[in-house]
Regions:
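Basic, glycine/lysine-rich polyanion-binding surfaces/domains
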Residues: 1-150
Length: 150
């Protein structure tokens, strides 16, 4: 990857989960500790069946009063359906924001040039109000920018 290039990932979609119970809801259903997710730290997680079989994987990034879920665009409807099954009486809202946000990738070097960026897996900063996270799977994968299309 050229260090100054930005690549739009057309195969990625964005779900936004917000509401009073959003943190507890995610903590109870995904494979990573949501308590570690903050304005400065993101995580990689999966959703499994009750029997422990893999269903989906995604990156969770804190944004405003909720969480962005960066997932495969072709699975977004199935993931939202599954999340709604687990929603029950939780005070949350689950929105497909794929038409309003794009996922882009920048080089690790470009990420580290951003203000307050650290060379730590999952480190998250803001750029023009949009979150940019050093990929929580491996920092060598670069930064992931969730950019508002407006």
């Amino acid at each position: 990857m050229e260090k100054d290039q930005i690549f739009i990932l057309k195969d990625r979609g964005i779900i936004y989960i917000s509401g009073e119970d959003a943190k507890e809801f995610l903590q109870n259903i995904v494979t990573n500790d949501i308590n570690k997710v903050s304005d400065t730290s993101s995580c990689f997680a999966s959703l499994l069946t009750p029997q422990g079989k893999y269903l989906f994987d995604f990156i969770i990034i804190r944004h405003k009063q909720g969480y962005f879920v960066d997932c495969e665009k072709n699975q977004i409807d199935q993931l939202i359906d599954r999340l709604n099954i687990y929603k029950l009486n939780s005070k949350i809202e689950i929105l497909n924001l794929s038409n309003e946000f794009e996922v882009a990738v920048i080089s690790k070097e470009k990420f580290l040039a951003l203000e307050n960026a650290k060379d730590i897996v999952g480190n998250t900063v803001k750029y023009n109000g949009d979150p940019v996270a050093l990929d929580p799977r491996s920092k060598n994968l670069g930064g992931r920018l969730i950019a508002n299309l407006e």
